[in-house]
Structures are given as C-alpha cells and as structure tokens.
Amino acid sequence: MELSFTKILVILFVGFLVFGPDKLPALGRAAGKALSEFKQATSGLTQDIRKNDSENKEDKQM
C-alpha cells in the first residue's frame, strides 16, 4: 500500500480532529519511538538469523 502526500494529509487532518492540537505532538513522538524500537528489534533479529545461517553453512562444509 503506497501512501501518497494526499493520503498523509488526510490522515493528519483526521488525527487533528480526533485528538486535538494538544495531544497530536505527543502521539507523534510515541509513534516515532515505537517505530524506532520496532526497527531495532527487527534489525537484531535479522542479524541473528544471518549469523545462524552462516554458522550452519560452515558446519555443513566440514
């Protein structure tokens, strides 16, 4: 699903209407922090999988 500029504006406008201008910055920070933590977790998981895969390949070669 591709988010165009118009769709992002609509989402922001609806968020502004639902949560109001006072809570919107805090929600944005919380969403950014959650996204950052998710990216770190998936990056760590990807590294673990690659490490285990390379170890398995080395074991098979021996």
UniProtKB/Swiss-Prot annotation:
A GO cellular-component term linked to this record: TAT protein transport complex
Subcellular location(s) per record: Cell membrane
Molecular functions (GO terms): protein transmembrane transporter activity
Keyword Signal set for record: no
Gene that this polypeptide is encoded by: tatAc
Keywords: Cell membrane, Membrane, Protein transport, Translocation, Transmembrane, Transmembrane helix, Transport
Transmembrane segments: 8-28
Membrane topology: Single-pass membrane protein
Oligomer status and interactors: Forms a complex with TatC.
PANTHER family in alphabetical order: SEC-INDEPENDENT PROTEIN TRANSLOCASE PROTEIN TATA
UniProt xrefs under Gene3D superfamilies: 1.20.5.3310
GO annotation, biological process: protein transport by the Tat complex
Cross-referenced InterPro entries: TatA/B/E (IPR003369), TatA/E (IPR006312)
Protein name: Sec-independent protein translocase protein TatAc
Record function comment: Part of the twin-arginine translocation (Tat) system that transports large folded proteins containing a characteristic twin-arginine motif in their signal peptide across membranes. TatA could form the protein-conducting channel of the Tat system.
Sequence similarity: Belongs to the TatA/E family.
NCBIfam families with a match to the protein in the record: PRK14861.1 (NF011430), tatAE (TIGR01411)
Pfam families in the record: TatA_B_E
